[in-house]
A protein has these predicted regions:
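Non-transmembrane, aqueous-exposed alpha-helical and coiled segments at domain scale
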Residues: 1-425
Length: 425
């Protein structure tokens, strides 16, 4: 079985929680795109963990985890993240973590450039996490990056690094007027944070190809959501990578494989980190109440998330882009404080009702939500474990979303713990 776990919205839908829950059915979990610019929060019997780079399967003792070729890796962050998990009792070794030799290294100057550009943009900034993601992907396509396979021979990299640094300083010093990047500092950084992972690096294409031939099941874990995809998201307020399920085999290094299923993760309401149009956004006390009820603060940045009612227009589009065969609806329990639950069923654009998600940023900025309101269920549902345990109003809300999105809802999350998930069929 080859399954992708993907976000249908702006990210932060609860993918890590669902990967942790479902990964017991899989032998291997693969991260295939992005970097440490988003976080997956997992609560299990070992504690609460926030994962930025590592696949969520790392929390299961018998699961092999892979960082695929499409990933960009900040070595310092990976060093600290693995150390933090080990302190929490999680075992990490080359036996359960394999890193593609083709994965790109996110260097310190990528983070520097990310911050310098956000500062230059001022009020026009994109809301970057300043983790260097866009600069490193840009350099990847300029063919001026290092890859994880290069860590096998750090001592022979100096000449190559010097050439890249000379080129980067044309921008860092020449363009932004910042102090130039120092080659010695970069080499020391690679030595300190890169060498510890040299034994983890391998040809993951060979590993995954052989594993699938041997009948192993693989889960592909995405980062962010469909609306952050570089091509089909809310451009330019997107990530720099392809966040779609269709990219999972490619970013994992096994483009010859075909997915069996794509499980789309969406919240029972909307949330968003960063800038850009967010049609269903709530403000003031209304937003504060939902943000506090849902604990809506970024796992990677700690930034308060923008929140709003469920957006059926955006979610339907996201599910289509992800080719979803089923939906996991998360944080249904958060809605229990509402008397009436708002659902955006369409947009009003220049006086006309539309039900398709606009691809043009200017149109999306002008769009206004058209709401319908459903009865709230006004009770604690966190102890529910079967569909029949849910109050009728909660089930009605789930069925309404299922019809609006056009995809069956297979899982419903009603609490943060592993057992707090209801399987609908």
């Amino acid at each position: 079985m080859l399954t992708a776990i993907v976000g249908t919205n702006w990210g932060d839908e609860g993918k890590g929680r669902m990967v942790d829950l479902l990964s017991e059915k899989y032998d291997i979990v693969v991260r295939y795109q992005g970097g440490n610019n988003a976080g997956h929060t997992v609560v299990n019997d070992k504690g609460k963990f926030i994962l930025n780079l590592l696949p969520s399967g790392i929390l299961r003792d018998d699961t092999v985890n892979v960082l695929g070729a499409g990933i960009v890796i900040d070595l310092e962050h990976l060093f600290n993240e693995t150390a933090r998990l080990r302190e929490g009792g999680i075992a990490i070794s080359p036996a359960n973590l394999k890193i593609s030799d083709r994965a790109t290294i996110c260097m310190p100057y990528h983070k520097l450039l990310d911050g310098l550009e956000e500062d230059r943009l001022g009020d026009k900034k994109f809301g970057s996490t300043r983790r260097g993601i866009s600069p490193v992907y840009a350099d990847k396509f300029m063919k001026k990056t290092l890859r994880m396979g290069d860590l096998k021979n750090i001592d022979h990299l100096r000449e190559r690094v010097a050439g890249i640094v000379e080129w980067k300083n044309l921008t860092v010093a020449g363009g932004y007027g910042h102090e130039p990047v120092d080659v010695d500092e970069i080499m020391a950084w690679l030595e300190k944070f890169g060498k510890p992972f040299a034994d983890y690096v391998c040809d993951t294409t060979v590993y995954l190809t052989e594993a699938v031939k041997d009948g192993k099941s693989v889960m592909f874990e995405a980062q962010l959501g469909a609306l952050r995809d570089i091509d089909f998201g809310i451009y330019p307020y997107t990530s720099a990578s392809t966040t779609l399920a269709a990219y999972a085999p490619i970013g994992s290094g096994v483009p010859q494989l075909k997915l069996d299923e794509s499980i789309g993760i969406m919240k029972a309401y909307s949330s968003c980190v960063g800038e850009g149009p967010f049609t269903c956004e709530m403000f003031g006390d209304e937003a504060h109440a939902l943000r506090e009820a849902g604990g809506e603060y970024g796992a990677a940045t700690g930034r308060p998330r923008r929140v709003g009612g469920f957006d059926a227009v955006a979610s339907r589009y996201g599910a289509q882009m992800q080719g979803c065969t089923a939906i996991a609806l998360t944080k249904l329990d958060v809605m229990s404080y509402m008397d009436k639950i708002p659902v955006c069923v369409a947009y009003e654009l220049d006086g006309k009702r539309i039900e398709n998600f606009p691809g043009n940023i200017e149109e999306l900025e002008r769009a206004k939500p058209v709401y319908e309101y459903l009865e709230g269920f006004k009770c604690d549902i966190s102890a529910c474990r079967k569909p029949e345990d849910l109050p009728k109003a909660a089930l009605d809300y789930v069925k309404y979303i299922e019809k609006a999105v056009g995809c069956p809802i297979k899982y419903i999350s009603v609490s943060a713990e592993r057992e707090g998930c209801i399987e609908m069929f």
